[in-house]
Structure formats: C-alpha cells, structure tokens
Amino acid sequence: MPQQIELRNIALQAAQPLVHGVSLTLQRGRVLALVGGSGSGKSLTCAATLGILPAGVRQTAGEILADGKPVSPCALRGIKIATIMQNPRSAFNPLHTMHTHARETCLALGKPADDATLTAAIEAVGLENAARVLKLYPFEMSGGMLQRMMIAMAVLCESPFIIADEPTTDLDVVAQARILDLLESIMQKQAPGMLLVTHDMGVVARLADDVAVMSHGKIVEQGDVETLFNVPKHAVTRSLVSAHLALYGMELAS
C-alpha cells in the first residue's frame, strides 16, 4: 500500500476555470487540513482525487501520483482511499439496511464480510446495540448516527488514506465532538493519511498536522498547523485564524 499520495498541478474547468494548479501531498500518519470558504474549490479537489467530478466539470491539467508513480483516481477509490462524505444521508441507498451497505462494501473490496467483522466496526465507532443498527434503514437514523456509520465503513475498508469532507457539518455540538473523537482515534490506531476538508479552524487546531488554504480555486498558503496559526501570511488565512481566535476573545498578533 502507498505511503504517499500527491496531487500535482490539478486544474478543473466547467464553463469557466474552477480549480487552478492545485498541488497537495498526503502522507501516512499525518492529517492535512484543506480549508477555505464555500466555493473555494475544496470539495471539487476531493472529487478529482477520487475520479467523481460532477457532470460538466472536467480535469484539464495535472496528475495524481502514489509513491511517485502516476495512478488513476479510480484505482484509488475505496481500496486506497476511503471517504467520509459531507452529507452522509446521500451516501446510503434508502432501500438497503446498514447490514447490506456494510457487507457489500466489504465484498467489493475483498474484505471479510462476516457479522462479527461488521459488528466490531460498528462498536468501534460507538454505536450501541450493533445488531439493531445493522437492521436499520438510513431514514431511521439521525445525521450523527449516519456519519458514524460512514466512519465505520471507512474502518472496514482498512484503506491507507481517508478523505473526510466536512465531516462535522450540520451536526449538533455533541455529535460533532463524537465525530472528532472517532477521527482522532482512527489516526492513533491505524495511522492513515487523512485529507480533512473543513471551514472550521477549531477542527483544524485539534486534528491537523499540516494545513493548505484555498481561495478562488487556488492554494494560497500551506504549512504546518503551528506556523499557520501563529504566523499566517495570506489575507485569507489571517481572516480565518482571526475569526477563530475571536471566538475565545483573542486577537491575532499584528
């Protein structure tokens, strides 16, 4: 399994350019946070990595490499990169139970799909009464439960990399804390490389090792999390950090 995945000079376009020459490097055991405002190109960059660009959007330049060798995004999806989506409800077929979803995911990846394996994954993400959860349909579960089920699927994949696209969006504070605890636990136990897409600098401060800031489809600043919080250089980065500090009655040093 690869130890590093690199996005090199990725450019995306629809009727007009959307993402301009984005380069990122994911490494096993490290969390890279991709931050920026809505519409900055974060989710499109993830979609390009997985080969699931929306209709009408195409990649016009750049490549993806695994351990320095060019690779197709389709060869990465699921096997080498597990995904925790922004809207978990849209990720599940409403006609299938959680047991069917989990079992089919395992079978598609050639992983063990016995009930003991599925139960262990569900218990690992803190969902009580795994036997009952496996019988549930998506519409019978809360957003927080579905997000934890998405994380359970990522655990089942045993992929060396994870893309978590706004994993705490639209969740209440308690559910957000649980999701962050789970992501932190996965990093400690499995040490995957993680691309964490978020607009929440509090999430960045807690989980990230490195940060890349996007604005208008471009990476405007990259660095380790400590440097970026203490000495942000770009105006967009300074704005994000200042807004985060203001929540605690603090100001960014001038």
Swiss-Prot record:
Membrane topology: Peripheral membrane protein
Gene Ontology MF terms: ABC-type nickel transporter activity; ATP binding; ATP hydrolysis activity; nickel cation binding
Compartment(s) where it occurs, according to its Swiss-Prot or TrEMBL record: Cell inner membrane
Pfam families associated with the record: ABC_tran
Name assigned to this protein: Nickel import ATP-binding protein NikD
Presence of the UniProt keyword ATP-binding in the record: yes
Gene field: nikD
Quaternary assembly: The complex is composed of two ATP-binding proteins (NikD and NikE), two transmembrane proteins (NikB and NikC) and a solute-binding protein (NikA).
Catalytic activity: Ni(2+)(out) + ATP + H2O = Ni(2+)(in) + ADP + phosphate + H(+)
